[in-house]
C-alpha cells in the first residue's frame, strides 16, 4: 500500500484521512478560491454533493481493478481482496433473520486501511472535471464562476461527468440532500440537474459542520457555535458538584473550548459583537470557579488564554 501512496494516487483535492490535511485545510483551500472570485464581483455557484452510504457502496472488484491500475502488486491485491471479501452479514426484519451472505461491497471505517482504500477508490472522481472540486473523504463540493452561460454550462457538464462516474462505479448520489449555494450579488439563481433530477437551492449549507451562507457572513456560524458551547457549559454547571479550579478548567478545556476553536481560522468572527459573544462564554466559565465569582474577568483568567486576545494576535 505504501508503494501506491508514494505514487501520489490520492490527489490534492482529497483532505480526508490524508497526512497534513484536515477539515480546516479543506475549507480554507476551497473557499479561498471561491471568495477570490466573489471579491472580484463574480457570481459563483457551489454544489454540495452527498453520496448514499458511500463507504458501504465501494465495490470490491472495482477497487481491486483500480489498485492494479495504480501499481499495487498482485500479492497485496489478493491480500486486500481476502480481507474485504471474507466478511458476511445478516439482517433482521420484523423478528425474522436472514441467512448469512458474503459482502461484495463496503470498506470498513473503523480501521486505518478502510479510509485509505476509499480515498483510492474515489481518486478518479474528478477526472475530466473543469471546475473546482474538493473532497473530505466522501463529502464533495464543486464550485465555479457562473457569470456567463459557458460558466453555467461548465458546471452542468461536470455534474454530468460526476453522475456518469457514480454509475460506472456502482455508487449513488443522495440527490435529495445535494444542494446548490448561490454566491455573489450577480447570481442568476441558475438551476442544475444531477442525472434526471433537479437540485434544490439553499441560502445556507453546513460544510464539514461549519455553516456557510449565501452572503459568506460568519455571524451565523459564530452564533451557532456559541449556542452549542453555552449548552455544554450549562450542562456542566448543573451536573458538576465541585467548583474547584482543578475540576472546572480541565472540563472547560475538554468539553467547551473545542466548540469555540473548531476550524475557527476559517469562520473567525469579523465583528466585535460576535467576538464578544464568544468571550462571554469564557467569562461565564471562570465565574463557575469557587472564590472567583466576584473577581474582575481579567484577574479570573489567571493562566487561561483570552479568546479575544488570541484572535487579535
Outline where the language-model segments fall.
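Conserved pre-catalytic core of RNA-dependent polymerases
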Residues: 1-108, 144, 305
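Active-site palm subdomain of RNA-directed nucleic acid polymerases
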Residues: 1-14, 115-144, 243
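Mobile genetic element proteins and their domesticated derivatives, centered on retroelements
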Residues: 1-4, 30, 50, 67, ...
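Catalytic palm active-site di-aspartate
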Residues: 14-18, 44-54, 80, 106-114, ...
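Catalytic palm subdomain of template-directed nucleic-acid polymerases
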Residues: 53-70, 131, 140-167, 269
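Short, conserved micro-motifs composed of acidic
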Residues: 95, 157, 172-206
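Basic, alpha-helical interaction scaffolds
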Residues: 199-266
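Short linear motifs embedded in intrinsically disordered, charge-biased segments
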Residues: 272-313
